[in-house]
Amino acid sequence: MGQADQIAVDVIIPVYKPDEKFHHLMKKMGQQSIRPANIFLMWTQGKTEEDEELQERYKQVEGVTLVPILPEAFNHGGTRNQGVALAKSPLVLLMTQDAVPKNAFLIENLIAQFAEEEVAAAYAKQLATIEVGIIEHYTRQFNYPDQSQKKTKADLQRLGIKTYFCSDVCAMYRKSVYDQMGGFVTKTIFNEDMIMAAKMIEAGYTVVYAADAKVWHAHKYNGKQQFQRNFDLGVSHRQYKEIFSGISSEKEGKKLVLQTLVHLWRKKRIDAIISLIWQSGWKFLGYQFGKRYDKLPLWLIRMASSQKSYWNNGKG
């Protein structure tokens, strides 16, 4: 516990209609080699009796603070900012409710990245679960390889948009730098993590991909969901064009598709190749429409987006 005495970590987790993965996550938090000083559950309130019972259950857990969030008040950046503002530790760990630590060393391995003062953020490797299929497994390996990596402004030419990649599925931040950057942007449909990473890198800090810090996390999206998710991605790139306009993300997307295609061909998975082409088409269309959202009528934007409530006040 000597290391824990030297540097403390607070954990912030937005919660909405949690399932078994969340309970596994909380159990794993209690088993970490370095335990978090505090866990702040930013709980978007449901209207069911079951949800109320779960809230009461976690209110009783030592070290856990449950912060009620009204559904209409939830914001990807703002809600996380609210949690970070409550934190007193020098490091804060942001997680989603469906990210389950693989072992007891997640927090320890992330903390280790901050031995160097210039490191402002570190994010974990995401492992695909069995049920998501071969395409998602390969995508996870592509985006989260076995080799750790330090990323600085000098890597923009080589890595392109991947320089700014960071995921709040499981990412630790140096709170002093986070505050210096003004926290997460509050007006964004999502992608607050990459926007923060971009600001940190542009300010001269380092973002680390820590391959030895691992969480189980993956999704199995259908064509419609792929379209909507990538529509929202395109929206965020359009809204923050000062960050993303000079760096193409489409080149990286093409590289992923081609490498996945080769992998599936070698595995003789013709069925998966057909699925890959289908999904990639929806991704591409969604992203292209999202980048041009400001030219679309609001009713069409609502249909295309996965974040319906984001558009309640118009195009913004």
Q: What are the language-model segments listed below?
A:
Residues P18-Q31:
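Short, well-formed alpha-helical segments that are part of the catalytic scaffolds
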Residues D232, G246-G316:
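Non-catalytic, C-terminal membrane-associated alpha-helical segments of glycosyltransferases
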Residues V100, A104-H137:
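Conserved donor NDP-sugar-binding/catalytic core segment of glycosyltransferases
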Residues K153-Y173, I189:
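A recurrent flexible, glycine/aromatic-enriched loop bordering the glycosyltransferase active site
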Residues V92:
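Short aromatic/hydrophobic "clamp" motif used to bind/position activated sugar donors
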Residues L70-A87:
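Glycine-rich, basic loop-to-helix element that forms the pyrophosphate-binding segment
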Residues M26, A37-K47, V67-I69:
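Short beta-strand/loop segment that forms part of the nucleotide-sugar
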